[in-house]
Amino acid sequence: MPHSSSGAPLDPVAFIHSQIRTVPDWPQPGVMFRDITTLLQSPKALRILVDLFVERYVDAKLDYVAGLDARGFIIAPIVAYELSVGFVPIRKVGKLPYKTRSESYDLEYGSATVEIHEDACRPGDRVIIMDDLIATGGTMMAGRNLLQRLGAEVVEGAAIIDLPDLGGSALLRNAGLPVYTVTEFAGH
């Protein structure tokens, strides 16, 4: 467990929260960007973060951890490795070399598409889907839909950060996907 400068133990979730940098007005005015690179640069913070996810899923009898392009690729393979399960990448369109299934979803301005290899998992496989952050929930919902089309059971959506004011975690839960996030930030 991390300790404060006085030597007192810190709550792991509070410690993770404290390691995330906020960058105002990036990538556009009015946005408060939650930057996980500072968390990833700290070996102690990264270990605590991975341990939180592993503790949550160690008894979930998973077959795979799916990660969403691009920042979901950072944490999901580490968690998969620690759980001794496979990693499934869900990528932006045109990035996977083999036969794929695709799913489009709406963004605030426009739309996007993600893809998965058609043989990434089998019917009945138990999967969690991970990303760094849940904002509107569109990417995670599209990833969940892809996994379900392959017959997988999507056990839960997981992320480091929730931005509840943007409604994504509520949207996912209302659609029947349980959601776990380590911490949350108010606002955008």
UniProtKB/Swiss-Prot annotation:
Pathway: Purine metabolism; AMP biosynthesis via salvage pathway; AMP from adenine: step 1/1. It is found in: Cytoplasm. Its EC number is 2.4.2.7. It catalyses: AMP + diphosphate = 5-phospho-alpha-D-ribose 1-diphosphate + adenine. Its main location: cytoplasm. Pfam families: Pribosyltran (PF00156). One of its GO terms (cellular component) is cytosol. Keywords: Cytoplasm, Glycosyltransferase, Purine salvage, Transferase. InterPro entries: Ade_phspho_trans, Adenine_PRTase, PRibTrfase_dom, PRTase-like. Catalyzes a salvage reaction resulting in the formation of AMP, that is energically less costly than de novo synthesis. HAMAP family: Aden_phosphoribosyltr. This is Adenine phosphoribosyltransferase. The gene is apt.
